[in-house]
Design a protein with these regions (language model features):
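C-terminal motif of bacterial Sec signal peptides marking the signal peptidase cleavage site
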Residues: 8-10
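Bacterial lipoprotein signal-peptidase II cleavage site
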Residues: 12-19
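A mature extracytoplasmic/lumenal domain signature
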Residues: 56-59, 83-85
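Disulfide-rich extracellular modules and peptides
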Residues: 13, 24, 42-43, 105, ...
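Sec-dependent N-terminal signal peptides
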Residues: 1-3
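N-terminal secretory signal peptides
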Residues: 19-56
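Extracytosolic low-complexity repeat regions of secreted or lipid-anchored proteins
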Residues: 65-135
Length: 135
């Protein structure tokens, strides 16, 4: 463990993000909706630009689920979703961890109750599953 930490520090860690910052959203169940963050992400995706959006959603019990959606077209990285469910007290065995999906396709999915609002569906993924959604 110490060798890993020393190695990460010596190498400078992950390179800084270079792209469009689409902001940080805090969305409680159905009570808030970050339209500008979603539009920023969608516009970057359509134009092939790098972008990052950070979202904190919550379980029905109120446990936070931080999620990051990264669009990184350069170098073939594509779309990366990281979702941390480790604070989900009712998540069940094996589901309280960080999930990572590396995907090649993203589409908008209108909400049933309000078609002006949408989430993202990501498909053709590797990592923790073949698809995922971002609220």
């Amino acid at each position: 463990m110490a060798a890993t930490l020393i190695s990460a520090v010596a190498c400078g860690g992950a390179p800084p993000f270079s792209g469009i910052e689409c902001g940080t959203a805090d969305e409680r169940l159905e009570s808030s909706y970050d339209a500008s963050g979603r539009e920023c992400v969608w516009n970057a995706y359509e134009r092939g630009n790098a972008a990052r959006w950070t979202l904190r959603s919550y379980t029905i019990e109120g446990d936070p689920i931080p999620t990051t959606l990264l669009i990184q077209p350069a170098g073939g990285i594509g779309l990366v979703v990281t979702r941390d469910t480790s604070a989900d007290k009712f998540g069940g065995v094996g589901n309280q961890r960080v999930f990572t999906y590396r995907c090649s396709t993203m589409t908008k999915m209108p909400r049933r109750d309000d078609i002006s609002r949408y989430s993202f569906i990501l498909t053709n993924c590797t990592g923790d599953g073949p698809s995922t959604s971002v609220p």
